[in-house]
Amino acid sequence: MELIFQNVWFVPLFPFLASILLGIGLFFFPNSIKKFRRLSSFISIMFLNIAMLLSFHFFWQQITGSPIHRYLWSWVLYKNFVLEIGYLLDPLTSIMLVLVTTVAVMVMIYSDSYMFYDEGYIKFFCYLSLFTASMLGLVLSPNLIQVYIFWELVGMCSYLLIGFWFTRPSAANACQKAFVTNRIGDFGLLLGILGFYWITGSFDFQQLSKRFFELLSYNQINLVFATLCALFLFLGPVAKSAQFPLHIWLPDAMEGPTPISALIHAATMVAAGIFLVARMFPLFQMLPFVMSIISWTGAITALLGATIALAQKDLKKGLAYSTMSQLGYMMLALGIGSYKAGLFHLITHAYSKALLFLGSGSVIHSMEPIVGYHPNKSQNMIFMGGLRQYMPITAITFLFGTLSLCGIPPFACFWSKDEILVNSWLHFPILGSIAFFTAGLTAFYMFRIYFLTFEGDFRGHFFDDVKKLSSISIWGSLEFNKEQFKLDKKSTLYPKEANNIMLFPLIILTIPTVFIGFIGILFDENKMNVDSLSYWLTLSINSFNYSNSEKFLEFLFNAIPSVSIAFFGILIAFYLYGPNFSFLKKEKKKLQLKSEIDIVLKSFSNFIYNWSYYRAYIDGFYSSFFIKGLRFLIKIVSFIDRWIIDGIINGIGIFSFFGGESLKYIEGGRISSYLFFIIFCMFLFFLYSYII
């Protein structure tokens, strides 16, 4: 058994080997390997399945009482400086290993069909395997330096995958935007790592917290400097997990293939920031100001993401802002000290959002032959509608993911989100109010997405009639006269259900979307009076002082407010976007008669629409203030460099040149001329002196 634990590094090694094999094949045999497309995906999936089985084995060993395993090797030795690499296996690590590998396997199986006809099919699996290996290496890292190395590898793979279709300008711009934004966070992370090494003399997670606590106990730490280092370190997770104000890259990252959105932007890369904050949680707890910044950053991000998602027309971008909002919930939980609730929501959200993204990919895949392959058409919810009758399995699984994200029992996200809501209210009512209000918005925009996509009448055949489609408001007025659209008789294309290879991951992911939430709930009293997840996390290196878990019935009773708010949001979405039953039509006509109310609602809806369309005006502000301001500053610097600095140097050179040319004619080589010149100058000097 000990031999198996000494070889934990096999988990990231297998997907890394798959990436290396496909990369070598593409480099040396580019034409031959394209004939073995299925074999390439089989290698990637098989190797990742081995890593997944190993992850489940390590997870089972950890939760059944196996001690924490930590293996280190000396990497750099210089005098008293020792830099070690290795791996750390505790319950938190094992949970993340299972999470990453299970979602990655489902995404790879799904991609086998989704990307099969793409020219970069093998390259896609090569990048995907490398990304998975990098994320697994990050999870296993025992110190900050190793985390930083894999952190950068994850960022590099994200850049490659977001810009996978780089010939499309929007995709090329999106991957550059993600890269530059994350560089800001990564620079802060590096400064924070170096700062804490300056304070404690260690990069190791366990030693770092222990030494920091000892120094803090003896008042040997400058709290201002320590707080500054912690905020710099927190800047890395802010960028990686798309927290305000470095969230702007996430919606544009939807330009990548949809399976990438399910893997990177649901369960892995964006979760890396949450994981790092959880790893550094014992240290952050000693700095109350930093914890306050973390909690408020999470709350603002949750609310901002929800408000921007309210009127999105792009299916994937709506889910992207939803991801941003839910990541804000996780950060809020960690900031208020609710360690278990934050990680609990990380787990439940990962499976639910992966299901939603893969479901959106199935929808987009079926819409592309009808409306075209450009994202502005195939991902536009205005051209969808009524897909439930054509894609019933996709619709049901998407509905399950929607119900989970809205916090409806007994789906997974209900248990974790409600715990965050209650804890945030108890910690500080203002934070709790923001969290509860955001929960209502989440229910509204998620069912808005569902109704626009799967309910009503199919609108895909009207995509080329711009004038008539412009009359279809995205704010609920989706009734239109079918007779006013004259369909071409040749137009017989309708969406089709995805094939079995794409449906298999959707069905499998439905299982954790429904049941994974039960790991955080106490159904019957045990000796420790604690739920399974809390017990597992107490065995981790980041053990925390948990309070007794609420009993099942008590938990449900406390969840009544959050569920009520969620149902209220669903009812509003149903009223605006749901099937147009006769009684709803009558109610809408009654409201239309009240002109004052109608004007107020219309002005409010226009404000919300503009807020969502212009992304809360944040992107425009960054573009005007930073990008245009930086370009203007560069022009000024360029002008100074060219005309002042270079002008002085060039002026001296020109003056020397013409001075030399002038003296060239005076110097004739005759001594009599030199004597005459000297005497003449002396005469002028004495004459000047005499006059003065």
Curated annotation (Swiss-Prot):
UniProt keyword annotations, A-Z: Chloroplast, Membrane, NAD, NADP, Plastid, Plastoquinone, Quinone, Thylakoid, Translocase, Transmembrane, Transmembrane helix, Transport
Molecular function terms from GO: NADH dehydrogenase (ubiquinone) activity; quinone binding
Major site of localization recorded for this protein: plastid
Membrane-spanning segments: 9-29, 39-59, 89-109, 120-140, 147-167, 184-204, 219-239, 258-278, 289-309, 327-347, 354-374, 395-415, 425-445, 503-523, 555-575, 643-663, 671-691
InterPro entries: NADH_UbQ_OxRdtase_chlpt_su5_C (IPR002128), NADHpl_OxRdtase_5_subgr (IPR018393), ND/Mrp_TM (IPR001750), NU5C-like (IPR003945), Proton_antipo_N (IPR001516)
Gene Ontology terms: biological process: ATP synthesis coupled electron transport
Catalytic activity: a plastoquinone + NADH + (n+1) H(+)(in) = a plastoquinol + NAD(+) + n H(+)(out); a plastoquinone + NADPH + (n+1) H(+)(in) = a plastoquinol + NADP(+) + n H(+)(out)
One GO location term (cellular component): chloroplast thylakoid membrane
E.C. number: 7.1.1.-
Topological relation to the membrane, as annotated: Multi-pass membrane protein
Superkingdom, taxonomy of origin: Eukaryota
Entry keyword annotation includes Ligase: no
Subcellular location: Plastid, Chloroplast thylakoid membrane
Family: Belongs to the complex I subunit 5 family.
Role according to the record: NDH shuttles electrons from NAD(P)H:plastoquinone, via FMN and iron-sulfur (Fe-S) centers, to quinones in the photosynthetic chain and possibly in a chloroplast respiratory chain. The immediate electron acceptor for the enzyme in this species is believed to be plastoquinone. Couples the redox reaction to proton translocation, and thus conserves the redox energy in a proton gradient.
Description of how the protein assembles with itself and partners: NDH is composed of at least 16 different subunits, 5 of which are encoded in the nucleus.
Record protein name field: NAD(P)H-quinone oxidoreductase subunit 5, chloroplastic
Source organism (scientific name): Marchantia polymorpha
